[in-house]
Amino acid sequence: MTSSPTVNLLDLDAQGLVAYCDSLGEKPFRAKQLQRWIHQYNAADFDGMTDLAKSLREKLKGRATISMPGIVSDNISTDGTRKWLIDVGNSNAVETVYIPEETRGTLCVSSQAGCAVNCRFCSTGKQGFSRNLTTAEIIGQLRMAEFALRASRGIDGGRATGGDGKGERVVTNVVMMGMGEPLLNYDAVVPAMRLMLDDNAYGLSRRRVTLSTSGVVPMMDRLGADLPVALAVSLHAPSDPLRDMLVPLNKKYPLRELMAACQRYLKVAPRDFITFEYCMLDGVNDSEAQARELLALTRDVPCKFNLIPFNPFPESGLIRSKPEQIKRFAQVLMDAGVVTTVRKTRGDDIDAACGQLAGAVKDRTRLAERTGKAAKVIEVRAV
């Protein structure tokens, strides 16, 4: 007789845990207990789950695991940005980035090893697509970061959600803006985001979880029906010919379809605007005339713009827009009454800035020479 396969409980959201407990002959409330132990108390095994019946703990030992991906390296930038390189097996690695600010801490989470979209200005796409991450590998990034950050700040175990009312949560916002296109890994990303929102797990509000997409129109509609979180769209061009070149997915879902999908999404979104991300490329998409084209393109979509100075990498053949040109471009948008921000480049000395995530372990000597900046590197063993 063959034994049942072992289940990684990190792969299961609340509904999945209830179904799993039912398969063991257990009541639904056991699923909530398990979820709290795993996601709020960082339990690594079942022995310490003292409010579970011993018989259930014994069942779980033989049939389930709480398996996290391994950590290859842990780097801290001079500006406080922290990047983990995560081993997801078969020579694949993904990156997770924490960006601390005065009033919040934002975690940038990866959804795929590599990326098939292959945007011209993004180094991740240049490595090609390896595979989708599992739900465990996605939510595991938040679990790992939250408790690593708590430990580094001397915050004892306990609830990751700050449920004691003391506001102890370190990660206050999650952005699905790491490696990969989240909507092309929908079936793993959505359960992970459900866990991010679940009060028995991480308890984030829908306004504090943002999914960034290059514009997979049918899946935008599906997300709006299933789990509408805050939405960011990687726009980067005001016209189809230019966007076809910068974001090849545009050939399948052109701008007219994308703008219509944004309008539909706003009917159910937790925020009353879409964030359009726009990578500033010298002489490519940064003229004042193109800013006016953007205004015409998005006039029927309540939105804000996040202008992102391009972070160069050798294979791109592109150059970052000059600061004064970014300022002029932004002014055109702001003069029209559109909220516009220019993203401050963070973590570029550890290749953690926007567009730099490539999943490769780089030679740190050459990295330091190239950036002219120091990076604090913490070596950690796989867990």
Curated annotation (Swiss-Prot):
It is found in: Cytoplasm. GO terms for biological process: rRNA base methylation; tRNA methylation. Its cofactor is [4Fe-4S] cluster. Its EC number is 2.1.1.192. Reaction proceeds by a ping-pong mechanism involving intermediate methylation of a conserved cysteine residue. S-adenosyl-L-methionine binds at G180, E181, S212, S234, L235, H236, N311. It catalyses: adenosine(2503) in 23S rRNA + 2 reduced [2Fe-2S]-[ferredoxin] + 2 S-adenosyl-L-methionine = 2-methyladenosine(2503) in 23S rRNA + 5'-deoxyadenosine + L-methionine + 2 oxidized [2Fe-2S]-[ferredoxin] + S-adenosyl-L-homocysteine; adenosine(37) in tRNA + 2 reduced [2Fe-2S]-[ferredoxin] + 2 S-adenosyl-L-methionine = 2-methyladenosine(37) in tRNA + 5'-deoxyadenosine + L-methionine + 2 oxidized [2Fe-2S]-[ferredoxin] + S-adenosyl-L-homocysteine. The keyword Iron-sulfur applies. The keyword Nucleus does not apply. PROSITE patterns: RADICAL_SAM. This is Dual-specificity RNA methyltransferase RlmN. SUPFAM superfamilies: Radical SAM enzymes. Belongs to the radical SAM superfamily. RlmN family. The gene is rlmN. Disulfide bonds join C108-C354. Keywords: 4Fe-4S, Cytoplasm, Disulfide bond, Iron, Iron-sulfur, Metal-binding, Methyltransferase, rRNA processing, S-adenosyl-L-methionine, Transferase, tRNA processing.
